[in-house]
């Protein structure tokens, strides 16, 4: 995948791990499902996040009227924390802690990419992670679910090292990237 179609960096480069872009969108696409008249939040599910992200979105002010229990501050904080946690899990080569926030397809894709890194004897480092802002862009309904879409602006340092030699495979240990998802 071409991560340029999902994220933008100030230096014109792309994040070496295109799945992070997709992952952020999946984490952002928290779905609200009506179950027995009660609303319950869950991640991604079977919702097509790309279709939701490209649709004309309704303003968040309408959503807060629909779901009075919705807390925008709580969601933006959760998204920031999940972004950092996801980067940390990837670097530790153990993505199981973020499994509840991933669709089956996304988790499988991430796991396959992680296995390839392990087979090559490489570790991808994402350091000096900062979520600069989380902006809830709006919401839409898809398949009976409410899908919320957000834009995250982040700063990272992204590079890959060879596990055996410690030599730099790709990226830059010092160059900051400013990303928008």
Outline where the language-model segments fall.
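Juxtamembrane and targeting peptides
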Residues: 2-81, 162
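Residue-identity detector for threonine
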Residues: 14, 32-33, 64, 73-76, ...
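Generic detector of bulky aromatic hydrophobic side chains
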Residues: 22, 90-93, 106, 115, ...
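Weak global preference for isoleucine
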Residues: 22-25, 95-98, 129-131, 156, ...
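Exposed beta-sheet edge and beta->alpha loop/turn motif
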Residues: 27-36, 141-181
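Core segments of small alpha/beta cavity-forming domains
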Residues: 48-129, 135
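Long, low-complexity alpha-helical segments
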Residues: 118-158
């Amino acid at each position: 995948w071409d991560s340029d179609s999902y994220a933008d960096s100030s230096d014109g480069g792309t994040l070496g791990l295109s799945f992070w872009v997709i992952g952020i969108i999946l984490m952002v696409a928290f779905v609200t499902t009506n179950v027995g008249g009660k609303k319950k939040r869950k991640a991604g599910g079977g919702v097509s996040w790309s279709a939701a992200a490209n649709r004309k979105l309704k303003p968040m002010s309408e959503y807060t009227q629909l779901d009075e229990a919705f807390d925008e501050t709580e969601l933006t904080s959760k998204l920031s924390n999940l972004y950092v946690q996801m980067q940390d899990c990837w670097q530790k080569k153990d993505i199981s802690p973020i499994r509840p926030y991933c669709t089956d397809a996304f988790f499988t894709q991430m796991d396959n990419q992680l296995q390839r890194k392990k087979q090559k004897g490489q570790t991808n480092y994402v350091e000096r992670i900062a979520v600069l802002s989380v902006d809830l862009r709006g919401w839409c309904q898809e398949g009976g679910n409410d899908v919320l879409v957000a834009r995250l602006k982040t700063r990272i340092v992204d590079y890959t090292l060879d596990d055996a030699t410690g030599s730099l495979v790709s990226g830059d240990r010092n160059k900051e990237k400013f990303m928008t998802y």
